[in-house]
């Protein structure tokens, strides 16, 4: 609530742009620049909301990945005996992991490699595919991955989780850039408001932990990341209409 209150105050305050002369940009000379108050520009406001949900999803997935992988790949029966997924065992022996937790950590490291690959490949793909459509497509991919994770198919669901990082890779920069489009001299204060949306990352882990403890299952707590990935999907699909509404608000 504090973050929202601060944003609400600053969105109506005219702050000086110290680089305005250097940039040589003027809202009066560029019809593409939106001069309406930020609060009246839906592509920006919903961009902040989308970033909030996405960051919550990203931090939640990062925080609970190792625990989920261990629970899904290593099944314990009532007697306490364990049944470990063959691929999990093979991967651990291949890397010389000292214990199952180390193996799970190596899997998350592989996921980080996918994240880096996705960031570069996503930037290249965005040259031929509209960024909003690419964002929506990646959001759909991650939603499907999380649904498989929530299905909790023993020895199987953990295999798809690392690919979540591949499709998360472009989300933050794409949402950030799309929400700041055509804001002109308001871009700086708008960017500051966007950065405040990362507070979502502080909210998801406690809620996911509560769900996991309440239902005695790591799988159920991934419903929060699912919601977080649906948000970029909807934002990407609706983006052209949102931008058009912002343009009309600026012209009014």
What are these regions (language model features)?
Residues 36-109:
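Extracytoplasmic gate region of multi-pass secondary transporters
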Residues 1-25, 233-240:
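C-terminal membrane-cytosol helix-exit motif in multi-pass small-molecule transporters
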């Amino acid at each position: 609530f504090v973050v929202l209150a601060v944003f609400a105050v600053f969105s109506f305050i005219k702050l000086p742009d110290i680089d305005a002369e250097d940039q040589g940009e003027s809202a009066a000379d560029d019809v593409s620049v939106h001069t309406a108050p930020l609060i009246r520009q839906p592509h920006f406001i919903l961009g902040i909301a989308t970033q909030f949900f996405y960051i919550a999803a990203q931090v939640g997935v990062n925080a609970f990945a190792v625990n989920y992988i261990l629970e899904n790949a290593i099944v314990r029966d009532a007697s306490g005996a364990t049944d470990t997924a063959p691929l999990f065992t093979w991967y651990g022996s291949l890397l010389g992991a000292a214990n199952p937790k180390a193996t799970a950590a190596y899997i998350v490291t592989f996921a980080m490699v996918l994240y880096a690959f996705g960031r570069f490949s996503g930037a290249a793909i965005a040259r031929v595919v509209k960024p909003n459509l690419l964002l929506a497509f990646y959001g759909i991919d991650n939603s499907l991955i999380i649904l498989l994770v929530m299905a909790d198919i023993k020895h199987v669901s953990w295999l798809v989780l690392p690919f979540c990082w591949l499709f998360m890779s472009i989300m933050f920069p794409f949402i950030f850039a799309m929400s700041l489009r055509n804001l002109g001299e308001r871009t700086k204060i708008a960017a500051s408001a966007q950065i405040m949306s990362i507070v979502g990352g502080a909210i998801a882990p406690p809620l996911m932990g509560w769900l996991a403890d309440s239902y005695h299952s790591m799988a159920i707590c991934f419903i929060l990341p699912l919601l977080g990935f649906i948000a970029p999907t909807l934002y990407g699909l609706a983006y052209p209409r949102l931008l058009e509404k912002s343009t009309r608000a600026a012209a009014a």
